[in-house]
């Protein structure tokens, strides 16, 4: 059964309840991404050196527990090499950021799983959406493991987490978010928009490049590469830095992940490519009189333009927390608009779908 036919099974108020639930989960994920960004920017991500999915829900409640948590932090290289002499009060500040980030992860897990099980029990979700929503849950469980895998990279030899693992962690969170946004749009059962195949191709390319750009941005963040080369449009004194500076590490591919100049340069070049592609897509959609797809393309181009301005300001000011978080927040908006644009251009044609019989609200199945 196709997605649109499947959504025929979900009549109000059933479909409304499912969409409200998924909207809340998507909003929580967006908040968690921003809290994660603040945790990184405040260098708080390694303040909790243990992984306790259940018992770690409660923070330290007594002086003895606080001192024990602080002593645990003192055993890792970040404290010894960067924060030696930190007071307990200062430790509490970074602890609360990381604890809040982990708590949000637990809240999201509960906010997703419990209503999902209830909807399944009530027969509110058909077979196709069951598979999709179980898949999203599996990605969420994987994300918890990836989060600890990331933190573990900074507990023994490094003074920070691996930028590659950080990028994987962020990108997986955004893939989960995008999957929920896509599902929400499909459940809305919007009429399809007739459009040329080239519009679909450029929309899909925009979505793929947006995810790649978010991954590259996470590499910049993980390396603190936004705190160097704080000029624009020049970088390292040129529009295109010398090959010797871009590719000095061996083997060559390490520069893509470890070289501050190369990582920031890649992020800039991808931003230019995304902006140009979004402009082309918007012009094409408007000229094609693509209706809702034209307005969607214009909104996406506007968001990418704002994102570009915020990115430039963030670099010029050496990554202040406020600008960096605004840049990350608008990145989530860009991703949302890119997902919606692809979905509206690739939605199945309703006329080709068999009509399913509505199921009464109280009847399972």
From Swiss-Prot:
<comment type="similarity">
    <text>Belongs to the COX15/CtaA family. Type 2 subfamily.</text>
</comment>
<keyword id="KW-0408">Iron</keyword>
<feature type="transmembrane region" description="Helical">
    <location>
        <begin position="17"/>
        <end position="37"/>
    </location>
</feature>
<dbReference type="GO" id="GO:0016653">
    <property type="term" value="F:oxidoreductase activity, acting on NAD(P)H, heme protein as acceptor"/>
</dbReference>
<dbReference type="InterPro" id="IPR023754">
    <property type="entry name" value="HemeA_Synthase_type2"/>
</dbReference>
<comment type="pathway">
    <text>Porphyrin-containing compound metabolism; heme A biosynthesis; heme A from heme O: step 1/1.</text>
</comment>
<feature type="transmembrane region" description="Helical">
    <location>
        <begin position="320"/>
        <end position="340"/>
    </location>
</feature>
<dbReference type="InterPro" id="IPR003780">
    <property type="entry name" value="COX15/CtaA_fam"/>
</dbReference>
<comment type="function">
    <text>Catalyzes the conversion of heme O to heme A by two successive hydroxylations of the methyl group at C8. The first hydroxylation forms heme I, the second hydroxylation results in an unstable dihydroxymethyl group, which spontaneously dehydrates, resulting in the formyl group of heme A.</text>
</comment>
<keyword id="KW-0812">Transmembrane</keyword>
<keyword id="KW-0472">Membrane</keyword>
<keyword id="KW-0479">Metal-binding</keyword>
<feature type="binding site" description="axial binding residue">
    <location>
        <position position="267"/>
    </location>
    <ligand>
        <name>heme</name>
    </ligand>
</feature>
<feature type="transmembrane region" description="Helical">
    <location>
        <begin position="107"/>
        <end position="127"/>
    </location>
</feature>
<feature type="transmembrane region" description="Helical">
    <location>
        <begin position="264"/>
        <end position="283"/>
    </location>
</feature>
<comment type="subunit">
    <text>Interacts with CtaB.</text>
</comment>
<keyword id="KW-1003">Cell membrane</keyword>
<keyword id="KW-1133">Transmembrane helix</keyword>
<dbReference type="Pfam" id="PF02628">
    <property type="entry name" value="COX15-CtaA"/>
</dbReference>
<feature type="transmembrane region" description="Helical">
    <location>
        <begin position="203"/>
        <end position="223"/>
    </location>
</feature>
<keyword id="KW-0350">Heme biosynthesis</keyword>
<keyword id="KW-0560">Oxidoreductase</keyword>
<feature type="transmembrane region" description="Helical">
    <location>
        <begin position="164"/>
        <end position="184"/>
    </location>
</feature>
<feature type="binding site" description="axial binding residue">
    <location>
        <position position="327"/>
    </location>
    <ligand>
        <name>heme</name>
    </ligand>
</feature>
<dbReference type="GO" id="GO:0005886">
    <property type="term" value="C:plasma membrane"/>
</dbReference>
<feature type="transmembrane region" description="Helical">
    <location>
        <begin position="296"/>
        <end position="316"/>
    </location>
</feature>
<dbReference type="GO" id="GO:0006784">
    <property type="term" value="P:heme A biosynthetic process"/>
</dbReference>
<dbReference type="GO" id="GO:0046872">
    <property type="term" value="F:metal ion binding"/>
</dbReference>
<feature type="transmembrane region" description="Helical">
    <location>
        <begin position="132"/>
        <end position="152"/>
    </location>
</feature>
<protein>
    <recommendedName>
        <fullName>Heme A synthase</fullName>
        <ecNumber>1.17.99.9</ecNumber>
    </recommendedName>
</protein>
